[in-house]
Amino acid sequence: MAPPNKFRINAKNYFLTYPHCSLTKEEALSQIKTLETPVNKLFIRICRELHEDGSPHLHVLIQFEGKFQCKNQRFFDLTSPHRSAHFHPNIQGAKSSTDVKSYMEKDGDVLDHGVFQIDGRSARGGCQSANDAYAEAINSGSKASALNILREKAPKDFVLQFHNLNSNLDRIFTPPIVEYISPFSSSSFDQVPEELDEWAVDNVVSAAARPLRPVSIVIEGDSRTGKTMWARSLGPHNYLCGHLDLSPKVYSNDAWFNVIDDVDPHYLKHFKEFMGAQRDWQSNTKYGKPVQIKGGIPTIFLCNPGPNSSYKEYLEEEKNSALRNWAVKNAIFVSLNGPLYSGSYQGATPNRQEDNQTTTG
């Protein structure tokens, strides 16, 4: 007569179920962590659920560093710290740790220890298809959550297509651009030259009232004359300072105008696109796929005097004569002789314009 089958499970991932177990997740985790095994435990997830009669039970997922052979069906027994009671689990090898992990998440009452190990089988096994993984990623609500889901459930795509995934998820989960609220109302600037006021009235307007080809403006003046604060008080805008970042994270195609502040004209990419208020152009100033710019809005260029700042001096260079002839047809140039505000406004309490829905870059 053949001897009875001996208990033995040889697996890297174990799925345990403790029926009618009154232990808390923390009590169970503490005991499981102390179990001595020849291979390290890398990840433990404990889930607490209630039966229909209200009695609790626990599910446990354990991921080992390598295969662990268990020959003792009492090895994973837990004890109550409060009374004389033992809790014996149903023990299974988990073919797809990701499917088990997802199953345990359905009620949300889980406790994790360690770092979850990606299981290649999870992308092909069970009912988890690639479409399911991507649908879950899109519905996750954030780029970080979506990437984590794809890392677990579509590891091949995560490794081979990470660049595309990263770029596409940036577009899908583009956060709203932080609104800029000007600390000063435009009326706070009581020394604005008439030509600046006239330019703003004609060109800084909503899309419905905007000229087909608005005119840009270059404002040159010393530091602390109020150039930047005045420009940013005019309405919804894109603010680009020091360098250009036209990614959807910071650049809005719904802005009324651009402000380019303290960018050396020698290194300004898309000079004509900005100054000429050109429409429907592409930029790849940052690494990655080109960004489509709607355009058609004027730009305020702010600069200080000097060879590395002044747009006038840049355009007066002999090699830029053709560009100068083009620029004077597409922008006006204003040099400030003093601040845009009188002394009485210096140090005054700023007047906030709560309706000035501007964007920042």
From Swiss-Prot:
It is found in: Host nucleus. A motif (RCR-2) lies at residues 57-59. Residues 8-116 form the CRESS-DNA virus Rep endonuclease domain. Essential for the replication of viral ssDNA. The closed circular ssDNA genome is first converted to a superhelical dsDNA. Rep binds a specific region at the genome origin of replication. It introduces an endonucleolytic nick within the conserved sequence 5'-TAATATTAC-3' in the intergenic region of the genome present in all geminiviruses, thereby initiating the rolling circle replication (RCR). Following cleavage, binds covalently to the 5'-phosphate of DNA as a tyrosyl ester. The cleavage gives rise to a free 3'-OH that serves as a primer for the cellular DNA polymerase. The active site is at Y103. This is Replication-associated protein. Homooligomer. Interacts with the replication enhancer protein (REn). Interacts with host retinoblastoma-related protein 1 (RBR1), and may thereby induce the transcription of host replicative enzymes even if the cell is not dividing anymore. Interacts with host PCNA. Interacts with host SCE1 protein. GO terms for molecular function: ATP binding; DNA binding; endodeoxyribonuclease activity, producing 5'-phosphomonoesters; helicase activity; metal ion binding; nucleotidyltransferase activity; structural molecule activity. The keyword Nucleotide-binding applies. GO terms for cellular component: host cell nucleus. One of its GO terms (biological process) is DNA replication. It comes from Tomato yellow leaf curl China virus. Belongs to the geminiviridae Rep protein family. It comes from the Viruses. InterPro entries: CRESS_DNA_REP, Gemini_AL1_CLV, Gemini_AL1_REP, Gemini_AL1_REP_central. Its EC number is 2.7.7.-, 3.1.21.-. Its cofactor is Mg(2+); Mn(2+). There are 3 rolling circle replication (RCR) motifs. RCR-2 is probably involved in metal coordination. RCR-3 is required for phosphodiester bond cleavage for initiation of RCR. A divalent metal cation binds at E49, H57, H59, D107. ATP binds at G221, D222, S223, R224, T225, G226, K227, T228. A motif (RCR-1) lies at residues 15-18. Residues 143-153 are annotated as: Binding to RBR1. Keywords: ATP-binding, Covalent protein-DNA linkage, DNA replication, DNA-binding, Endonuclease, Helicase, Host nucleus, Host-virus interaction, Hydrolase, Metal-binding, Multifunctional enzyme, Nuclease, Nucleotide-binding, Nucleotidyltransferase, Transferase. Divalent metal cations, possibly Mg(2+) or Mn(2+). Residues 156-176 are annotated as: Oligomerization. A motif (RCR-3) lies at residues 103-106.
